[in-house]
UniProtKB/Swiss-Prot annotation:
PANTHER family with a match to the protein in the record: UPF0102 PROTEIN YRAN
Taxonomic placement: Bacteria, Bacillati, Actinomycetota, Actinomycetes, Streptosporangiales
Domain of life: Bacteria
UniProt xrefs under Gene3D superfamilies: 3.40.1350.10
Protein name in the entry: UPF0102 protein Tfu_0669
Family: Belongs to the UPF0102 family.
Family annotation (HAMAP family): UPF0102
Native source organism of the sequence: Thermobifida fusca (strain YX)
Transmembrane region(s): none
Molecular function in Gene Ontology: nucleic acid binding
Length: 124
């Protein structure tokens, strides 16, 4: 049981580190992070950011190794559509009339603590 709990903690920590890296990356590339880990009954958005007049809904996927495919492959069409719907809901709830774009930031961590980030814009 301890091993399972430890693995869950490691995954959570990896995910948090990935989201922090993604937020810094987005900021360096001209976006303003509005909110992180926004939740409602229909789901969660990892990062909400603004770039010019566009509200950007960002899904962050961090993976340690390629065993289960790349991080970007983990975000399928169903997930992309759900993220777009969540973006519209956030915008409505916050009185935001900006155009909405869904991006995915995939982070792959390889042995030797090598972190690789890939940003796909406008996936939905």
């Amino acid at each position: 049981m301890r091993t399972r709990a430890r693995l869950a903690d490691q995954r959570r920590t990896l995910g948090q580190r990935g989201e922090e890296l993604a937020a810094r990356y987005l900021t360096r590339h001209g976006m303003r992070v509005l909110q992180r880990n926004w939740r409602c009954r229909d789901g969660e958005i990892d990062i909400l950011a603004r770039q010019d007049r566009t509200l950007v809904v960002v899904e962050v996927k961090t993976r340690a190794g390629r065993r289960f495919g790349t991080p970007l492959e983990a975000v399928d069409e169903t997930k992309r559509a759900r993220l777009r719907a969540l973006g519209y809901r956030w915008a409505r709830d916050h009185g935001c009339s900006a155009r909405i774009r869904v991006d995915v930031v995939g982070i792959l961590v390889l042995p030797g603590n090598q972190w690789f980030l890939r940003h796909q814009r406008g996936v939905a």
